[in-house]
Each structure stands twice: as C-alpha cells, then as structure tokens.
Swiss-Prot record:
Domain of life: Viruses
Name of this protein: Anti-apoptotic ORF4 protein
Keyword Zinc among UniProt keywords: no
Gene that encodes it: ORF4
Principal location listed in the UniProt entry: host cell
Protein source organism: Porcine circovirus 2
Length: 59
C-alpha cells in the first residue's frame, strides 16, 4: 500500500508517496524533483504521515 501527501509552498505544489511499511527515516522525493523531505514519524494505525522532517526544501 502506498500513500500520498501533498505539500504546498510559494513555488510549487507536489505529491510525496511512500509505502506504509517504509522505514521511519526513509527518504522521499517527489516525481518532478521539485522538493524533498525526510519522514520523521510513521503512525502505526493510520494511512497518512503524522510528521515530516523540517528539511523540506523547495527551489
């Protein structure tokens, strides 16, 4: 199962996808390369991320 998160910034709106079984520190990158983020926490009984690392970057 994969899940998708959508982040919005001043410059771009982009989806991040991840496997529900992914490592808590799994590195994620969107399909266009616009931005990237690192997962900091995955919930045990939910299908969405509860937290994303502050390292989110956009051009």
């Amino acid at each position: 199962m994969t899940c998708t998160l959508v982040f919005q910034s001043r410059f771009c709106i982009f989806p991040l996808t991840f496997k529900s079984s992914a490592s808590p520190r799994k590195f994620l990158t969107n399909v266009t390369g616009c931005c990237s983020a690192t997962v900091t926490r995955l919930p045990l009984s939910n299908k969405v991320l509860t937290a994303v690392d502050r390292s989110l970057r956009c051009p």
